[in-house]
Design a protein with these regions (language model features):
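Conserved N-terminal phosphate-binding loop of PLP-dependent enzymes in the Aspartate aminotransferase
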Residues: 1-402
């Protein structure tokens, strides 16, 4: 079928919930995607920070093939070896701090949903039934289930789905005074992203980090959403390591499965012990197939020098982006950490226009805000691929800056 015929069929059979445009890809290898017409694109979206080893990575393909031919699913009324092994790796990673217990899910939204439930149960049992409120940040994004939508500090996403889950309160990113003022006897936790991916690639300030530490010292739980920042994207396995934070609960997804549906939340013993059989569950989370993929990805990130590669390629990419900014005058700021990079443009330049210009250069990028474009290559991107991306992106920016 032609691309047009397939898209027409998709429009007739699928919910109209995504602005997919006219791109339809049929295969991928490494950093490249091939569309239905045989055209190849350099992929700096990576499934939105998900395909951290690129497309059709041999380690992932081998893990899927071997495990699928052995055991795919049993449910969580039984133990399975791959999930035990992956949980052990996550909690024994040197930067995990006091994180000690893992619950596997299928997505980031599910991971955050479980984290919110756990925080509320902890608050009720430790401080009383009134202690169930959770503070989150404006411009945050935590998912699209009712609880995670309620935790997401973006009113435009709320308007058609009221009433939201009560007990979620928002403060502005990096407003330490507002954060402290929002805390009361009903507050059990604060939920933050170290870097707001969907919100514009905005990072926690040093002052705000200190305020979070003080609240944590005074008994509030700190939940960190690492769905987009985790699994090495920022240069450490968890981004919170670079902010000097030690969360009570952390959520993971995206890179954890490298394109396979896999999420998790991890908690310290003192918090995790408040969940008992029947408090939370999932049919498919932590299935042997997904966990086998997670094991392969974890091993590759930790053993193949990928974290060092993130640092080197991030420096190379930022250096080239700064040259583009200087040459075009269209860029106001480069933001982010590691290979989670946001390019903020002047207000007259829309992210959609940059994305369209990149399409013309056979390169894929994704928006974060109306004037912020994200660059999210896999962690194993090479120096040559960074050079190619800079050439394509530079040509696109020159076009929109005219």
């Amino acid at each position: 079928m032609t691309t047009e015929d397939l898209i027409e069929l998709g429009n007739s059979a699928l919910f109209n919930t995504y602005n997919r445009g006219d791109k339809l890809f049929v295969s991928g290898k490494g950093l490249y995607l091939t569309n239905n017409d045989g055209e190849e694109y350099l992929d700096f979206v990576s499934g939105i920070a998900t395909n951290i080893l690129g497309h059709a990575n041999e380690k992932i393909v081998d893990a899927v093939t071997k495990q699928a031919s052995t055991l795919m699913h049993t449910s969580n009324i039984y133990w399975n070896k791959p999930s035990i092994e992956l949980a052990d790796k996550l909690v024994n990673y040197k930067g995990a701090g006091k994180l000690a217990k893992v619950f596997f899910s299928n997505s980031g939204a599910e991971a955050n949903e479980g984290a919110l439930k756990l925080a509320r149960k902890y608050g009720r049992e430790v401080n009383g039934e009134h202690c169930t409120e959770i503070i989150t940040l404006t411009d945050s994004f935590h998912g699209r289930t009712m609880a995670t939508l309620s935790a997401t500090g973006q009113p435009d996403m709320h308007k058609d789905f009221q009433p939201l889950l009560p007990g979620l309160n928002y403060v502005a990113l990096n407003d330490s005074d507002a954060l402290k003022a929002a805390v009361n006897e009903n507050t059990c936790a604060v939920l933050v992203e170290t870097i707001q991916g969907e919100g514009g690639i905005n990072s926690l300030s040093d002052e705000f980090v200190q305020a979070l530490k003080e609240l944590q010292d005074n008994g509030l739980l700190l939940i960190i959403d690492e769905v987009q920042t985790g699994m090495g994207r920022t240069g450490t396995l968890f981004s919170f390591e670079q902010f000097g934070l030690e969360p009570d609960i952390v959520s993971l997804a995206k890179g954890l499965g490298g394109g396979f549906p896999l999420g998790a939340f991890i908690a310290t013993d003192k918090v995790a012990d408040h969940f008992n059989p029947g408090d939370h569950g999932t049919t498919l989370g932590g299935n042997p197939l997904g966990a086998a993929v997670g094991n392969a990805i974890f091993d590759e990130v930790m053993d193949a020098g990928l974290l060092d590669n993130v640092a080197a390629r991030a420096e190379q990419l930022n250096r080239g982006l700064q040259q583009i900014a200087d040459q075009t005058g269209a860029v106001t700021e480069l933001k982010g950490l590691g290979l989670l990079i946001g390019v903020q443009f002047k207000d007259k330049v829309q992210a959609a226009d940059v994305i369209a210009a990149c399409y013309d250069e056979k390169m894929l990028v994704v928006a974060a805000k109306h004037n912020v474009v994200r660059l999210l290559p896999p962690l194993n991107v090479t120096a040559a691929e960074i050079d190619e991306a800079l050439e394509k992106f530079g040509a696109a920016v020159e076009k929109v800056a005219e």
